[in-house]
Curated annotation (Swiss-Prot):
Transmembrane segments: none
Organism per entry: Neosartorya fischeri (strain ATCC 1020 / DSM 3700 / CBS 544.65 / FGSC A1164 / JCM 1740 / NRRL 181 / WB 181) (Aspergillus fischerianus)
Entry keywords, A to Z: Lipid transport, Lipid-binding, Membrane, Mitochondrion, Mitochondrion outer membrane, Transmembrane, Transmembrane beta strand, Transport
Complex formation: Component of the ER-mitochondria encounter structure (ERMES) or MDM complex, composed of mmm1, mdm10, mdm12 and mdm34.
Family per record: Belongs to the MDM34 family.
Regions of compositional bias (Basic and acidic residues) in chain numbering: 371-381
GO terms (BP aspect): mitochondrial genome maintenance; mitochondrion-endoplasmic reticulum membrane tethering; phospholipid transport
Gene behind this protein: mdm34
Protein name according to UniProt: Mitochondrial distribution and morphology protein 34
Length: 572
């Protein structure tokens, strides 16, 4: 079986060549070009020649009036030629530097200056040989698929034929590109051309698409502000209604570019905050200070004045576990600030000691255990030894509270930011230098109880009240250790009353006993009932403080929620 191909009509149709040139230009610029080619490759001339290819039928799979499918062996050695035009880079150093990373190559000043030269390439003397699968259909066009690489050789003529290196380089690069063209791009080009020739619907749709592209390419560009977002907001984040949007224009004085979506603004805000938290998905928590917000200068924030709980200082927070004075509530903090009479002593009680320091107080001194020793000393001195607590004794010639000299105690404080005690609490008592605490510290409570008891005794006649004695006995029975101490105190009082006349009047008392001694005009001693009540009250307070110390590591609000029981009633 033989076929006759009429090759002359393909050479006579001018529109066919124009369309083929456009398709070849698009195909050559579709794939990545080598760095030496700095411009688009344009097909300026195309000619299929007068010699047709030779086809040998190997297999026919389907044959009908409107379709055909078969396998051919094709060989071509004709006079077809193709002319291309582009621009190339003549400076190889510029091409080398563009294809290498900047940190690994030198940066010359003038040696790498680009130099582009126009290039014209003519491809001729094609020699093709390969197996072709051909499928023809009037509805689907022609499909040509090459089983193998059909390109054997071709001749490349260019402007740089006089330079052997450039000529060989162009020959190699163009051959590689043509192999890709025959295997991938040429079947698609032939298929589109066949559809344009035999399928009118495809031709009409292609013309409509061309008109649409030309219409879109002409005229002014689209205004991005012509269609505002769905949820527009102004520069301050306030939502805008439709009337406000219509009043805005490109010529108005209002900054129209600030009309952005609220969602986009939130994303930008999250991106801005990511440098503080190193994460875009960190949830925002109210009244929380992030560590990344602080700086090394935050250590001086504590000396800058009284800080309001509603405007905290941005500094790192340190939770000091086990320190009762490190967790003041707002009420005690405000009361201490309002009662403070010294303007130089300022502190910040917001949160967990904001600005108090960068490091925890695990290395600080341990809490001292204060023990009252009521045993009778073996020496001739009858005064009991007191270690960091208040023991209440009386003497026949005790000095007056108002006239007693103030002893000087050299004691260092544990907490450098502890505020001074309120002067309102010590109106009737001298301010004894001792460790000052917060509103829940123990020395303040002890002096308050003592001042109330002395005030009650001054108003009423000192007497032994059976009701008060019963309450005291009930309190002492609940705590055996306190009862032993109270019993020791009563025995000590009886012995001191018996030997009170022989005691010297110039005996110096400890500084912690001075606030609790009441001096009478006649020099008479304090009533024994008052001393017993004081000893019992101190024992009860020590028991409560021991209970609070055992719960120091518990939750903060649990300790404050425990209401203190009122002191026992005293007889008048």
């Amino acid at each position: 079986m033989a076929f006759n191909f009429n090759w002359s009509p393909l050479m006579a149709d001018a529109s066919f060549y124009t369309r083929a040139q456009d398709l070849l230009t698009a195909a050559l610029n579709k794939s990545p070009k080598p760095p030496i080619i700095v411009d688009d490759i344009i097909v300026t001339e195309l000619n299929l020649g007068s010699i047709p290819p030779e086809l040998e039928i190997l297999e026919i799979g389907d044959l009908a009036e409107d379709r055909f499918r078969g396998i051919f062996k094709m060989s071509y050695s004709g006079d077809a030629f193709l002319t291309l035009k582009t621009r190339v880079q003549a400076n190889p150093l510029n091409t080398y530097l563009l294809t290498r990373p900047s940190f690994a190559t030198p940066r010359p000043l003038a040696a790498a200056t680009p130099l582009t030269i126009p290039l014209q390439i003519t491809l001729s003397d094609f020699k093709l040989s390969g197996f072709v699968i051909l499928v023809f259909s009037k509805q689907k066009g022609i499909t040509v698929v090459f089983r193998n690489d059909p390109l054997e050789s071709l001749k490349v003529s260019s402007t740089f034929d006089s330079i052997p290196f450039v000529r060989d380089f162009l020959q190699k690069e163009i051959e590689a590109q043509l192999r890709i063209l025959f295997m991938d791009e040429l079947p698609a080009i032939i298929h589109r051309l066949s559809l344009r020739l035999w399928v009118p619907e495809y031709r009409a749709g292609e013309e409509l698409q061309t008109q649409t592209e030309s219409a879109n390419g002409e005229g002014p560009g689209q205004d991005p502000l012509a269609s505002p977002p769905q949820d527009p907001v102004d520069a301050l984040g306030n939502a805008l209604n439709e009337s406000e949007i219509e009043s805005l224009s490109l010529d108005s004085s209002v900054e129209t570019h600030s009309l952005f979506s609220q969602k986009n603004l939130l994303r930008l805000a999250a991106l801005t905050d990511s440098q503080r938290t190193l994460s875009l998905f960190t949830p925002s928590i109210r009244e929380v200070v992030y560590r990344a917000w602080t700086s090394p200068s935050d250590q001086t924030d504590a000396s800058g004045g009284v800080t309001s709980p509603f405007s905290p200082v941005l500094s790192r927070t340190q939770s000091q576990v086990g320190s009762m004075s490190s967790f003041p509530d707002s009420a005690s903090m405000v009361s201490n600030q309002s009662r403070s009479s010294t303007p130089s002593h300022t502190f910040s009680g917001y949160g967990l000691s904001l600005g108090a320091g960068r490091h925890s107080k695990a290395h600080a001194r341990k809490r001292k255990k204060r023990v009252v020793d009521l045993r009778r000393p073996k020496t001739t001195d009858d005064a009991p030894s007191v270690s960091d607590e208040s023991a209440f004794t009386e003497s026949t010639s005790t000095p007056s509270i108002c006239s007693a000299p103030m002893p000087v105690l050299d004691e260092q404080t544990d907490d450098p930011v502890t505020p001074p005690l309120s002067p309102d609490r010590d109106l009737h008592l001298p301010a004894i230098p001792e460790r000052h605490g917060m509103s829940i510290s123990r020395p303040a409570l002890r002096r308050e109880i003592a001042s109330e008891m002395i005030r009650d005794t001054a108003e009423s006649k000192p007497s032994s009240n059976p009701v008060g004695q019963a309450i005291q006995d009930e309190d002492l029975s609940a705590t055996p250790r306190a009862a032993v101490r109270a019993h020791g105190a009563s025995v000590l009082e009886k012995e001191k009353q018996a030997t009170g006349s022989s005691a010297g009047s110039s005996r110096q008392l400890p500084s912690t006993i001075l606030p609790f001694i009441n001096d009478s005009p006649t020099g008479r001693v304090v009533d024994q009932a008052l001393v017993e009540r004081l000893a019992g009250e101190i024992a009860r307070r020590m028991r409560d403080e021991k209970f609070l110390a055992s719960n120091a590591c518990g939750p903060f609000w649990d300790r404050h929620s425990q209401e203190e029981s009122p002191p026992p009633a005293y007889g008048h």
